[in-house]
């Protein structure tokens, strides 16, 4: 095992562009050591394969370009990965909806235990991952011959997307599943940046009192070029749709600036944003737990503070 180290990273993409989380996942692969290959499964996705070939440190790109993979349905994608898995000691994907859907199926097919949401590589078989909503970090060691791992993208700096020139090798479709078929998708359109990609995020909690009041955040977000997020309490109360949700059961974000407004700071919310570079909290309750992680705190009524903030921008 020790003399055979080779990692396959499953690229996340939309058939035209590689998603940034794949570059963070590659950083984890580099930390493991050994050779690193990328698998692109899609349809009419040569552009993605070309982009992958240019990524720094990638030795080879495997391209499965077939109509069967147009929507990267998890059943077929897992079967495809299994067909090449014997060549690799480690198989990694970002811990996104995509990675969390595909890799557990692969783990079952390979009969190994998946290691989820790693935040650090200690050695080729030992990793750190958060548990209990991020309040503890577990160090786990795997004895499986093939290590199947999802990577928390925010914990790793992305590798450079240029400087490489890897060969691209075609892979044939394998055991395409008819268990599921793609019916359609509804994508929320927004002029604001996507939550996990934004460098500034402003989030509202139960203290916002209504969905209408989120316009106070939106005005500020548009002045700052920020994304708008929310706590689970705000989502459960119906103030905003659940794609706004930041936290353990929502999106994990680590922007340069995170502004928490009317959010008390339950541990599940902190799990989703505590790695942000600078955290600013506005809350009228001076005992709110959010102030314990905030770099800057303002004890104030948000309905006074937000208009003032907006006017000063």
Question: Which functions belong to the PLM regions below?
Answer:
Residues 1-313:
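N-terminal glycine-rich FAD/FM-binding segment characteristic of electron-transfer flavoproteins
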């Amino acid at each position: 095992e020790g003399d055979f180290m080779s990692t396959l990273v499953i690229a996340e993409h939309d058939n035209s562009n590689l998603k940034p989380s794949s570059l963070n996942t590659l950083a984890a692969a580099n930390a493991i050591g050994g050779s690193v290959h990328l698998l692109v499964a899609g349809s009419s996705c040569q552009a993605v394969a070309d982009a992958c070939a240019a990524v720094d440190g990638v030795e080879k790109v495997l391209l499965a370009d077939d109509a069967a993979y147009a929507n990267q349905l998890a059943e077929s994608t897992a079967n495809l990965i299994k067909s090449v898995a014997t060549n690799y000691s480690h198989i990694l994907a970002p811990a996104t909806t995509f990675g969390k859907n595909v890799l557990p199926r692969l783990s079952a097919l390979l009969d190994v235990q998946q290691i989820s949401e790693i935040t650090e590589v200690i050695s080729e078989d030992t990793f750190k991952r958060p548990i209990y909503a991020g309040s503890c970090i577990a160090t786990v060691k795997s004895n499986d011959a093939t290590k199947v791992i999802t990577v928390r993208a925010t914990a790793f700096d992305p590798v450079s997307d240029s400087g490489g020139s890897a060969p691209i090798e075609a892979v044939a479709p394998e055991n395409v599943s008819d268990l599921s078929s793609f019916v359609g998708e509804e994508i929320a359109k927004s002029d604001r940046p996507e939550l996990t990609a934004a460098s500034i995020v402003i989030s509202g909690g139960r203290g916002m009192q209504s969905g209408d009041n989120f316009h106070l955040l939106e005005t500020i977000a548009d002045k700052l070029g920020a994304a708008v997020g929310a706590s689970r309490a705000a989502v459960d109360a119906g103030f905003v749709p659940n794609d706004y949700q930041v936290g353990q059961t929502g999106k994990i974000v680590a922007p340069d600036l995170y502004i928490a407004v009317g959010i008390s700071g339950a541990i599940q919310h902190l799990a989703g944003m505590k790695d942000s570079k600078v955290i600013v909290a506005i809350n009228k309750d001076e005992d709110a737990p959010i102030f314990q992680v905030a770099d800057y705190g303002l004890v104030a009524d948000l309905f006074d503070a937000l208009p003032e903030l907006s006017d000063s921008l």
